[in-house]
């Protein structure tokens, strides 16, 4: 960026105009340039420190104020601003040391507040509490400080009351409203939390339209608003992050992503750690490589969101990067005790063990499951006793604790089941699920996985229907919210139990919804009905009826520009590979017209599959596939060449 040229005599006026117009970046550039000429100018350093503070660059602000203290040690404000800048930069030991230089009685109250904030930042809650108790009780900020301490101790309800009292005394303040929302979120009372968040957002839009709320979601290209003090005071970033977290907890994943794009636009290097963490987490399904990079980057920062460490390890386990998870645990032993609960550590330890010693891992998981089931039995008893005593608060507390324990138990149970699933020992998987029916029979994830394991056993389609049907009926009005695999498995189960009418009715329902979406959004690709037909085609191929099965597979991918995708190609090529294998062994013969149909299909896939990946590679794969080979076009040519070779047709 070119340095602004300023005429003689206009320097001071230009600087103050830039500051007045909140063009701090330009002001910093001019001031930095001028300070090279006038080394350690007090006026220049003071303005530069102020500008750095306004754009939240606290490290450089602290550097300016440190120089100012050396120039003018008698000015107490510089000592205060220096300590505040160090605190804001999370340099807590340095900030605490700087506060001791404040010996003017007029700054006693501010010094105490700053020292308490430093102790709070260092998570020295008892130290912070003793300092807060020294402050005047009539100071409304003491209510806020006590609220923060109560929140940190997990007393969310009492903390919430403190913040509400402070708001009544001080009037509406965005940061207080956010604190109240955060308390409600921690108590899992999402409706009042969202109400306070909505208030913050509405006020931010009304008072600061220049911050461009919602512009990115609308697809409008806007320049970064930067990390200004104004943005910080609106609490918009915090509000949108909390809204995203609530929507994510409620499994409204699109709304969660939208909350992140609705926030005022900033460039990636300007993003705060919480936003970066949430972006990584909520876009993991579509941008896993990027997500891992962001979480790994955050782990190197100080401080980072406390959830980062556990989430990175859990995601490594989800994607089966157990070696990486083990490395992170070994390299960051000091973080283990600080950021991982005993439950999470034991769970991750068992998951890592799965890779090399599945039997040992199963025993570790079994021990963890036993501990959690014991807790749930105790909590069930507490709920019954509280209901008998008509103690609604105790009932509510015990039910919440039970639900939290169940959410810990489900992943442990699924990890146990997966060990036997990978061995294709489906009877053992079913046995594990049956043992957990006492606790999980109402849980959607449990019901879904029970359905899958029954479906895989071939002779239990009727029982599988009993579990798949309630899931589908629950979302019948928005049937495309159900995964295509579930719909396909239910259709196959209907066919295998001679309930063809039910299968056809379900397929008509899917077709009707797909037509409606195609009408509203012609460019959107929807694969549900296509995958259902592909799975049915696969079923007929598996039963040896290749002519009907392959024909169904081919028809399901029409029109190719709408139906050909990585997932649909995966199902189609499996059928073709099975067909070619059986033809090469002379176990089946195809009529010439069917072979012609197959060749035409593969040629269509070759045309439409140029920009479609044949395989979605793992995000952290070191050896990447050749870009020219990882396409549907390349694989369809390979299949066509094999078909010509096996049938001895002339090219």
UniProtKB/Swiss-Prot annotation:
GO terms for cellular component: axonemal microtubule; cilium; intraciliary transport particle B. It is found in: Cell projection, Cilium. One of its GO terms (molecular function) is intraciliary transport particle B binding. One of its GO terms (biological process) is intraciliary transport. Residues 494-521 form a coiled coil. The keyword Coiled coil applies. Keywords: Cell projection, Cilium, Cilium biogenesis/degradation, Coiled coil, Repeat, TPR repeat. InterPro entries: TPR-like_helical_dom_sf (IPR011990), TPR_rpt (IPR019734), TT30 (IPR039941). The keyword Coiled coil applies. It holds the Pfam family TPR_6. TPR repeats lie at residues 8-41, 42-75, 140-173, 175-207, 372-405, 410-443, 445-478, 530-563. Its main location: other. Required for polyglutamylation of axonemal tubulin. Plays a role in anterograde intraflagellar transport (IFT), the process by which cilia precursors are transported from the base of the cilium to the site of their incorporation at the tip. Belongs to the TTC30/dfy-1/fleer family. This is Intraflagellar transport protein 70A.
């Amino acid at each position: 960026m070119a340095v602004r040229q300023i005429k003689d005599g206009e320097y001071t006026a230009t600087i103050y105009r830039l500051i007045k117009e909140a063009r701090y970046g330009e002001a910093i550039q001019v001031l930095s340039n001028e300070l090279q000429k006038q080394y350690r100018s007090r006026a220049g350093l003071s303005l530069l420190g102020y500008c750095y503070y306004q754009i939240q660059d606290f490290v450089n602000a602290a550097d300016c104020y440190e120089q100012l203290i050396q120039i003018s040690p008698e000015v107490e404000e510089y000592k205060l601003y220096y300590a505040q800048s160090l605190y804001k930069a999370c340099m807590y030991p340095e900030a605490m040391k700087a506060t001791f230089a404040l010996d003017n009685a007029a700054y006693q109250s501010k010094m105490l507040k700053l020292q308490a904030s430093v102790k709070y930042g260092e998570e020295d809650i008892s130290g912070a509490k003793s300092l807060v108790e020294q402050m005047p009780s009539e100071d409304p900020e003491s209510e806020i400080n006590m609220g923060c301490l109560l929140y940190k101790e997990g007393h969310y309800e009492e903390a919430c009351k403190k913040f509400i009292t402070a708001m009544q005394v001080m009037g509406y303040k965005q940061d207080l409203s956010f604190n109240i929302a955060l308390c409600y979120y921690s108590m899992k009372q999402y409706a009042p939390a969202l109400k306070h968040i909505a208030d913050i957002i509405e006020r931010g839009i009304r008072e600061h339209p220049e911050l461009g709320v919602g512009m990115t979601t609308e697809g409008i290209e806007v320049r970064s608003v930067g990390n200004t003090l104004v943005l910080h005071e609106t609490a918009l970033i915090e509000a949108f992050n909390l809204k995203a977290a609530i929507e994510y907890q409620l499994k409204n994943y699109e709304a969660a992503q939208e909350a992140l794009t609705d926030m005022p636009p900033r460039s990636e290097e300007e993003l705060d750690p919480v936003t970066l963490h949430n972006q990584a987490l909520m876009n993991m399904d579509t941008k896993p490589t990027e997500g891992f990079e962001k979480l790994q980057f955050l782990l190197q920062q100080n401080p980072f969101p406390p959830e980062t460490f556990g989430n990175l390890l859990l995601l490594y386990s989800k994607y089966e990067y157990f070696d990486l998870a083990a490395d992170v645990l070994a390299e960051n032993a000091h973080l283990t005790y600080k950021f991982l609960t005993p439950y999470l550590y034991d769970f991750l330890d068992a998951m890592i063990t799965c890779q090399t010693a599945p039997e040992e891992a199963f025993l570790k998981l079994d021990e963890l499951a036993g501990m959690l089931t014991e807790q749930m039995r105790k909590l069930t008893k507490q709920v019954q006793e509280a209901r008998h005593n008509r103690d609604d608060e105790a009932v509510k507390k015990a039910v919440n604790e039970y639900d939290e324990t169940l959410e810990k138990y489900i992943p442990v149970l699924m990890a146990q089941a997966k060990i036997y699933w990978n061995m294709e020992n489906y009877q053992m998987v079913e046995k594990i699920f049956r043992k957990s029916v006492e606790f999980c029979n109402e849980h959607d994830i449990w019901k879904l996985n029970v359905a899958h394991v029954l479906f895989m056993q071939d002779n239990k389609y009727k029982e599988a229907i009993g579990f798949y049907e309630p899931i589908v009926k629950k979302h019948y009005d928005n049937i495309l919210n159900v995964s295509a695999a579930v719909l396909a498995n239910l259709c196959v189960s209907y066919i295998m139990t001679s309930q063809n009418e039910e299968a056809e009715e379900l397929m008509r329902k899917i077709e009707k919804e797909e037509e409606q979406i195609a009408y509203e959004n012609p460019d959107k690709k929807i694969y549900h009905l296509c995958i259902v037909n592909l799975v049915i085609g696969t079923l007929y191929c598996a039963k040896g009826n290749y002519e009907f099965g392959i024909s169904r597979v081919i028809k399901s991918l029409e029109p190719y520009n709408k139906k050909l995708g990585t997932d649909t190609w995966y199902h189609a090529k499996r059928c073709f590979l099975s067909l070619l294998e059986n033809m090469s062994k002379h176990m089946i013969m195809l009529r010439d017209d069917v072979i012609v149909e197959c060749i035409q299909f593969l040629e269509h896939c070759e045309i439409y599959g140029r920009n479609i990946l044949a395989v979605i590679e793992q995000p952290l794969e070191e050896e990447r596939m050749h870009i020219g080979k990882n396409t549907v076009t390349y694989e369809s040519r390979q299949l066509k060449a094999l078909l010509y070779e096996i049938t001895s047709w002339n090219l």
